[in-house]
């Protein structure tokens, strides 16, 4: 068995021992915490449902006046990694009238403190871009 196969088996064993129900509950709790915080931040627009039970640990959003690549770069300067761009979903973006977006995601290795840090830094994106709000 090659190292790649052993690593995959170890990851599967880890998740099976942990229990996917626990993984799902943790992911949902972090998503809920983040959604509730984002809804309080002006100029943030969540794309899709704001019901955490309808999400899979992924929140897609835009920020008024800020290109997603700029948002990702600014958040990266705070040590926060998000995705930006089309997310291989250009037809959906066109249908929604969204050229590009940001995407934050959470999983078992993320913490409430990391979500709170993201929510603390998210409003600074517009400030870094020169907006006075």
What are these regions (language model features)?
Residues 4-133:
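Pyridoxal 5′-phosphate
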């Amino acid at each position: 068995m090659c190292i790649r196969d052993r690593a995959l088996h170890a990851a599967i064993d880890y998740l099976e021992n942990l229990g996917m129900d626990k993984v799902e509950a943790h992911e949902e709790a972090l998503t809920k915490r983040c959604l509730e915080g984002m809804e309080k931040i002006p100029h943030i627009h969540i794309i899709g449902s704001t019901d955490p039970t309808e999400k899979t640990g992924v929140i897609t959003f835009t920020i008024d006046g800020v290109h997603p690549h700029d948002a990702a770069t600014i958040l990266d300067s705070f040590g926060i990694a998000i995705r930006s761009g089309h997310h291989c979903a250009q037809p959906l973006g066109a249908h929604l009238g969204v050229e590009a977006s940001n995407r934050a995601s959470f999983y078992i290795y993320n913490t409430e403190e990391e979500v709170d840090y993201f929510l603390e830094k998210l409003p600074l994106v517009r400030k870094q871009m020169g907006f006075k709000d």
